């Protein structure tokens, strides 16, 4: 293989060129032809059992070239990456077959150039403040209750008992709007914990005080619901079949034994562990928010000229992600605009701003990493494996076979960056 690189300053793009020729290309074409033959489908013959004379009629040079190109894209990229590259890409290079012939294959990898930035101050910044972390008794109780859910007892209530918050209710329901049933508003034998907020606001509260048998409740669908129902009143006909009370286990040492948590034997130790876990999570959230705000401050103090193509490409990627998220919610752009009242221009402006911030964040953090030269030690890698093993309940040796080492190192470097920025600012 031969490698060249070209810097296209005017367009803010770079290009790597890799040429495959000689024996390497000849051998690749032979392998490509064999692959095409092996996967060839001809009416009247089984795949891989087609007589050579018949097969040759269907194997065109373009099919062989296309297969050979697919075979060489990844090796060519690895070859280009292994060179002492002067041109630094900011995104994933896009491969293009510039020339394909019997003599050679030329692949071009196009990418946005990583712009030179003038990094502002990133230490001793006092304008971003750190929040203090406090854990309340109520928060500890809420987490303990979640643990208790594993051992909850369900006891049927008396026939004349009324529904209370926390009860488990089995019921049929059918929704009506303007006197007509609507799609998706009906179910039989549905089981619901009152107060779990599984239904729209007001639905579960309206069930409190009801008894067994038939009843009606009136609700209004919230603003962010599907366009067909958003902000509209509806009536639900209910048939309450069964009401059960939820009985939590006693919060004592016996509960702790049932939980079988490592290094926790008494309820007092359990409470301490819960408080410690909440504190760690809150501290991590505070730290992440602080660093996000800090990075935005560093961006303001830095000089960055983003290539127009980089912003456009990143905006397009965010648009695809956004549309995919809408699809998961049963929406599309048209329905989203109707619900929110936003125009195409407003949506594009928001996505463009997000794209710009994402690119600037990448460049600023990349520059800080480069300057500080964070070192990933074996101890840090092993500690990360142990944490993952504890988190998922899988042996560390098994985790090592499941996790990409480079991605793990990247995570560790990011953790080091966050810790560094948090410790040296505020």
UniProtKB/Swiss-Prot annotation:
Entry-linked PROSITE patterns = FKBP_PPIASE
Q: What is its EC number?
A: 5.2.1.8
Q: Where in the cell is it found?
A: Cytoplasm
Q: What does this protein do?
A: Involved in protein export. Acts as a chaperone by maintaining the newly synthesized protein in an open conformation. Functions as a peptidyl-prolyl cis-trans isomerase.
Kindly give the NCBIfam families that the UniProt entry links to this protein: tig
To which protein family does this belong? Belongs to the FKBP-type PPIase family. Tig subfamily.
Which named protein is this?
Trigger factor
Query: What is the organism of origin for this protein?
Result: Mesoplasma florum (strain ATCC 33453 / NBRC 100688 / NCTC 11704 / L1)
């Amino acid at each position: 293989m031969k490698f060249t690189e070209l810097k296209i300053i005017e367009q803010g793009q770079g290009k790597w060129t890799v040429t495959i020729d000689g024996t390497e290309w000849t051998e690749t074409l032979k392998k490509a032809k064999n692959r095409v033959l092996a996967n060839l489908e001809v009416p009247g013959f089984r795949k891989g059992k087609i007589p050579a004379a018949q097969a040759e009629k269907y194997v065109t040079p373009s099919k062989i070239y296309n297969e050979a190109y697919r075979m060489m894209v990844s090796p060519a990229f690895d070859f280009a990456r292994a060179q002492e590259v002067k041109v630094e890409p900011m995104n994933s290079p896009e491969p293009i077959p510039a020339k394909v012939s019997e003599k050679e294959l030329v692949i071009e990898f196009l990418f946005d150039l990583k712009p030179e930035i003038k990094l502002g101050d990133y230490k001793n910044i006092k304008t971003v403040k750190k929040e203090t972390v406090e854990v309340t008794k109520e928060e500890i109780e809420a987490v303990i209750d979640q643990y208790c859910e594993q051992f909850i007892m369900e006891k049927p209530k008396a026939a004349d008992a009324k529904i209370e918050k926390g009860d488990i209710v089995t019921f049929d329901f059918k929704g009506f709007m303007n006197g007509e049933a609507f799609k998706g508003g009906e179910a039989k034998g549905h089981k619901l914990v009152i107060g779990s907020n599984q239904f729209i606001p007001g639905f579960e509260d309206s069930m409190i005080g009801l008894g067994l048998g038939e009843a009606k409740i009136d609700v209004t669908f919230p603003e962010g619901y599907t366009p067909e129902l958003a902000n509209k009143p509806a009536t639900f006909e209910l048939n309450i079949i069964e009401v059960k009370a939820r009985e939590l286990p006693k919060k004592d040492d016996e509960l702790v034994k049932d939980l079988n948590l490592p290094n926790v034997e008494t309820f007092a130790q359990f409470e301490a562990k819960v408080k410690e876990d909440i504190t760690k999570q809150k501290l991590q959230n505070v730290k992440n928010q602080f660093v996000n705000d800090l990075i935005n401050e560093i961006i303001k103090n830095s000089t960055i000229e983003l290539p127009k193509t980089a912003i456009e490409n990143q905006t397009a990627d965010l648009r695809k992600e956004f549309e995919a998220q809408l699809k998961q919610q049963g929406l599309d752009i048209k329905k989203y605009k109707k619900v929110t009242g936003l125009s195409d221009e407003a949506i594009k402006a928001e996505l463009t701003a997000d794209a710009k911030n994402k690119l600037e964040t990448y460049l600023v953090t990349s520059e800080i990493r480069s300057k500080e030269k964070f070192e990933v030690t074996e101890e840090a890698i092993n500690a990360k494996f142990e944490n993952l093993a504890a988190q998922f309940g899988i042996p560390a040796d098994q985790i090592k076979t499941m996790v990409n080492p480079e991605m793990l190192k990247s995570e560790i470097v990011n953790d080091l960056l966050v810790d560094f920025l948090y410790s040296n600012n505020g």
